[in-house]
């Protein structure tokens, strides 16, 4: 794994731990719900045995496929430890690896229980539909017996609907946590898998094993969404087989009940679980994986291979060609939603025009920024070497105020990127290729506007970190009596000079980009402030959307303010006053 991506396992394992902790804590609620499921499953089995009905072939194939993906994933986790840790012949590492990977199987096994629970519910709904069709088309059954069978099916259908809602309610927070865990797993492994697939250090067997495990987990999680979609479909399946001549009061009442009872399986009330949302999540995974891969290409030192140069060229051409078309389609969808005041439409056009121009300049000027990042690398190596020699090791050796600045900036950046993705995720009405392409392009381009200023911030943050290291070490040298410490003044002088030159060069290269970004932030800030007032007071808007827009506006303002504040911090550390020095210490 590249050294600059060493933090990704911490993110992935932290997410895994949070999901596993919630699964284990909430187990008692699921166990009580599974007891109710067992009773209704026995009832469905008894009715199917009485009538001679069998399980639907589609449900049976899904169950076999889910069992295969579960078995393969669990065995792969355990066998991977036995194969790779056995070579080292270290029992401590073998035990730790087994403990970790057996814990990871909890994430897969728990979704299997969710799948099996909904599979039994879908099987019950399918039996109700088959039995209802037989009752309606039967000529030998009298009306009294038909009425009795209809009442039994009605009661079974109602129990199945209530059980499905209970399953969704108890498993909702857990499936939300597991969905986030799978999202992080997919983004990180997709990016790292792409990097390793072009590497010669790993064998073909390891690449094949990793890709097969990745796709097995993807299919395994897809089946969870598909079974939810199947339950909803079977619960309200159209009854075209009921002719008007065979309609009775009981049958009419049942059909009215079934058509008016809709089963919406929402995860924590946030979004429906179906194939449509699955495809949108896959599109989001692709967007974030591309963003991580772009970060990898930049951090490895620019376009050094034909593959990376071709990728960057094609990505820029496709983005600049398709983005105006996508923005025009978004404008059409925006107009079709509801009737807006004319000034809202004008400001919306201004906002998209400015954003496109900024993105155009950002992509065209990428080579200059890559040059600045290349010049930062030797300086960073020198800075890390000096920090290690002075006793300031790693991130813990950095001043606390600088660490807080970095963490807050990462939080605002992550918030803006993730919330923009979620907003676009929920704004799609139907899953068609146009909406998926629109989602991909808008997600990627919105991230461009947020990620490019982050490079400027990180460069200034490292420069401020270097100036602070020089200042702290200089205070120690001045107060020291050792001649060895006093000889370090030349090293500090050289480091201070390099930091100053690099800061001036980065500011020169990034100046047009930051001027364009400032104009973009100014336009978006003015327009969103106006929109916030209009949507809050003049138009009927949900309270949650008002809160979301307000928080988004203030987080965006804080995100940009941190860039200006970082410039002030770098200048302050460069010109740090030496009031603590006495005249005797100056020589």
Swiss-Prot record:
Membrane topology listed for this record: Multi-pass membrane protein
Cell compartments where the protein resides: Cell membrane
Extracellular side: 26-62, 119-277, 331-403, 540-587
Keyword Ribosomal protein: no
Superkingdom of source: Eukaryota
Any single GO BP term: signal transduction
Pfam families: 7tm_7
Membrane spanning residue stretches: 5-25, 63-83, 98-118, 278-298, 310-330, 404-424, 519-539
Parts of the chain on the Cytoplasmic side: 1-4, 84-97, 299-309, 425-518
UniProt entry tagged with the keyword Iron-sulfur: no
Gene Ontology CC annotations of this record: plasma membrane
Carbohydrate-modified residues: 159
Keywords: Cell membrane, Glycoprotein, Membrane, Receptor, Transducer, Transmembrane, Transmembrane helix
Function: Probable gustatory receptor which mediates acceptance or avoidance behavior, depending on its substrates.
Family under the similarity heading: Belongs to the insect chemoreceptor superfamily. Gustatory receptor (GR) family. Gr22e subfamily.
Protein name: Putative gustatory receptor 59b
Organism: Drosophila erecta (Fruit fly)
Protein encoded by which gene: Gr59b
